[in-house]
Amino acid sequence: MPAAAYQGKECVCQFRRGICDQTCVQGMLETPFYIACLKLTGRRCLVVGGGEIGLEKVEGLLACDGRVVLVAPDAVPGLEALAAEGSIEWIRREYEPGDLERTFIAIAATDDTDINIRVYEDAERRAMLVNVVDVPPLCNFILPAIVRTGPLAIAISTAGASPALAKRIKRQVAEEFGSEYARLAVMLNEVRGWAKGTLPTYQDRKAFFEGIVNGAPDPIELLRDGDETAVRELIAAAQRAYAPAAA
């Protein structure tokens, strides 16, 4: 486990009490995260902790089709309901290392520092993705704030420095990027097959799509005005312009 990110239980306890000198997390701010989107469909996702935060994490994993397993002796009503309807598997006991077997991603959402450290250390030994909620020293990945509209997802992260600031930025981004952006993404996806089959190089395909997105008239403004037909005409015109000339 990275020494710069984790210096033992004392460091974690100080961090949670707000008296940490921050040396244990400074490296996280100085080293940029590798941003990626994970495909969770059908993958086992472990959540340890049955409180409201655990419920929030479970709902996020379910929204991405993860196969969620909850480990907790007790759970809030929302989690109980998800287990009762079969949406999640609920193991009603304290965490054990074997719970990580065949697991893709683990999230610890308990208020017990010892359990959180055990989950982190056990997952690190398995080279597994693990996040202990609100304790950056016990994370090898962090969960950004997400603005999601249809296929459009925008992630906002402060590298764990300030979740509150990330949420403020999320609200501002959500106001700026509305449903018209998601609709344009869907419309552009409809011609991806044509582009791959017709335009011979990556640079050709890049120029085709950028010509639509950044062209005039602005497709976003057209969609804001409800003129989807005009956007389809823009796309059709770009197809004619970029298609290779017949031999």
PLM feature spans:
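E1/E1-like adenylate-forming module used to activate ubiquitin-like modifiers
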Residues: 111, 132-182
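Short loop/edge segments at beta-strand edges and connector loops
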Residues: 72, 90-94, 134
